Amino acid sequence: ELNDEFSGAKITPRVIDGKYKYKHNFLWDFCSLIFQNILSMPIKIGYAKFKFKIKYIGKEKIKKYKKEGYFVYVNHTQQFADTFIPSIPIYPKRNFFIVNPENISVKPFGTIIEMLGALPVPGNKEAMKNFLDIIREKIEKKCSITIYPEAHIWPYYTGIRPFKSVSFKYPVELKKPTFCMTNTYQRYGKKNNRLRIVTYIDGPFFA
């Protein structure tokens, strides 16, 4: 099964049908913006810096598209950090990420994750229409959409794994640029016994 969720736990997934609200009112969206791009950013940056000594190579490629919406594909190697590793070099552009329903199924954390930018995969045709509409809307508003196309979270793995080609339909249909972020793990320290994340940014790619 080429799907996964960030939580790492067995959770009864929330039903994402036509009643699920992908689009919210102004107040909800404003609070999401504050939470996503202001209040949480120091935590994201601090965690990435002190836990992983993260380094990004190729940030200038993304900066050239700061006035345009685009898609980002990332390898899936961290449960928690994967939710924000792409957001740091993309900032201050708002970054949304596609997740499985399990990620928003535990209250009250599900709402928090939604406000941080999670867009759950739809469960039926009616929900799919709303899902595609919100992706189109976010891209038109010059936001970015992050997709983890690989199967399961394999911690610290840097090889290429199989993934569903259907995950690439979004940039093809919307004719928008696509970037790739590849998280690698490199040793450092006096005894070469510590690991840091070095993220390589490539693109843009066009269909």
What does each model-found stretch correspond to?
Residues 53-207:
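Soluble catalytic domains of membrane acyltransferases
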Residues 7-58, 108-115:
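A transmembrane-helix-recognition feature enriched in membrane-embedded lipid enzymes
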